[in-house]
C-alpha cells in the first residue's frame, strides 16, 4: 500500500481521507465515490450500523452521476491493475468494482446506500 494520496478511478482527482468510526476511507469530493480497503465494506453493509449511516449521509450530498459502467477502472492503490466489475451478492445485485490485487472496492456515489437497503 502506498502512502501517497490515491486518485479517484472515475475522475482522476485526488481522493480525500475520511475517518468514520475508526474506519479510514478515501472519498472523491467531486463525484462522491468511495474507496474501501479489503474487508472494510463488511463493516459498513449492515443497515443498523451507525458508521455506515454517517458515510451514506456524507455521500448523499453528491448527486448520482451519469456513470459509464462499461469503462474499466484502475485501482487507486495499484494504478497498473484494472478492477473487476462484479455483482455484490446474489441477494443484492448491485455491481461494484473490486481490485484483484488488494481486494479493495470502489463504490460509486449511490452504491453503498443500495447495498445497505
For every predicted segment, state its role:
Residues 19-25, 87-96:
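Short linker/helix segments within small regulatory modules
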Residues 14, 31-34, 78-82, 102-105:
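Cys/His-rich metal-chelating microdomains
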